């Protein structure tokens, strides 16, 4: 299972229609598009997937549709994290039923939970996942939960934990985690430091921009494996030029707009309160979509 979890995993977006409802057909196309790019797996229902502006039922629908499209073809990780332990457990049970390979959960947020409460939260989810390994999701910039290195070391050694998604710019901490846990599956979470994360000890990555240029990240990983750091750095720079634009326009809405111009997503909208991409940026995103489609071909 550890080998199966390693690799380049796209953090899947969730398409919506003009009425803000789940766009199931676009979701299916997006799954297929990612598989065509040679992605090793999908991380479903996380931050990129706008999980926290969806109902529990919608999140289950997304998991089911993705499993129908991709189960057995690539690795599937279901993000099931909620503030509520019971809701997280429900999603974990659904992920197991749908045939996912692992579950993941962000640290519970908003309320100032104690570290032991965090540990109990993860234990309960693991108990509901019917044997699926847990990918602990550490993203302090969004969760507001700033785990110490000792706390991370404790979480990743809980029974049932198989991996850590480390969405932090702290590469020193990444290396410290790898040094302490040589067999842990460790994901880099920030796309803009993917190459650096691999050099610091990550086995692979989970990222949002993989949806539109997954082949670039696969090429970076290959270059690192082969010791060609110059190529990895050049490719990372090319990825970061795209990321610069996406940050300027809004990452999730920018990605959906690019995918719309690629004829993958019908409607380039995130769920409110996210706003659409500002009109002056559309020509740049259209040009980017064209460039990437030529490169992909």
UniProtKB/Swiss-Prot annotation:
It comes from the Bacteria. Aceneuramate binds at residues 47-48, 167, 189, 191-192, 208. It is found in: Cytoplasm. Its main location: cytoplasm. Its EC number is 4.1.3.3. One of its GO terms (molecular function) is N-acetylneuraminate lyase activity. This is N-acetylneuraminate lyase. The gene is nanA.
């Amino acid at each position: 299972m550890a080998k199966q979890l390693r690799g380049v995993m796209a953090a899947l977006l969730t398409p919506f229609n003009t009425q803000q409802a789940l766009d199931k057909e676009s979701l299916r196309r997006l799954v297929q598009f990612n598989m065509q790019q040679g992605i090793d797996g999908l991380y479903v229902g996380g931050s990129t997937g706008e999980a926290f502006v969806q109902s529990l039922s919608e999140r289950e629908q997304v998991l089911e549709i993705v499993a129908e499209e991709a189960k057995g073809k690539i690795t599937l990780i279901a993000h099931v994290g909620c503030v509520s332990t019971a809701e997280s457990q429900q999603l974990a049970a659904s992920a197991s039923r749908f045939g996912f390979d692992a579950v993941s959960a962000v640290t519970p947020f908003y309320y100032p939970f104690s570290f032991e409460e965090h540990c109990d939260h993860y234990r309960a989810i693991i108990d509901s996942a019917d044997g699926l390994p847990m990918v602990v999701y550490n993203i302090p910039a969004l969760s507001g939960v700033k785990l110490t290195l000792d706390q991370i070391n404790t979480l990743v050694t809980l029974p049932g934990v198989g991996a850590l998604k480390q969405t932090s710019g702290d590469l020193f901490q990444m290396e410290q985690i790898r040094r302490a846990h040589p067999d842990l599956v460790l994901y880099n979470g920030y796309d803009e430091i993917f190459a650096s994360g691999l050099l610091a000890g990550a086995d692979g990555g989970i990222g949002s921009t993989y949806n539109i240029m997954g082949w670039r990240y696969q090429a970076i990983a290959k270059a690192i494996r082969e010791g060609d750091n110059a190529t990895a750095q050049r490719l990372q720079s090319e990825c970061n030029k795209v990321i610069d634009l996406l940050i300027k326009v809004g990452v999730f809405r920018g990605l959906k707009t690019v995918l719309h111009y690629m004829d993958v997503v019908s409607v380039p909208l995130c769920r409110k309160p996210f706003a659409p991409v500002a009109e002056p940026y559309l020509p740049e995103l259209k040009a980017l979509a064209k460039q990437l489609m030529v490169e992909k071909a």
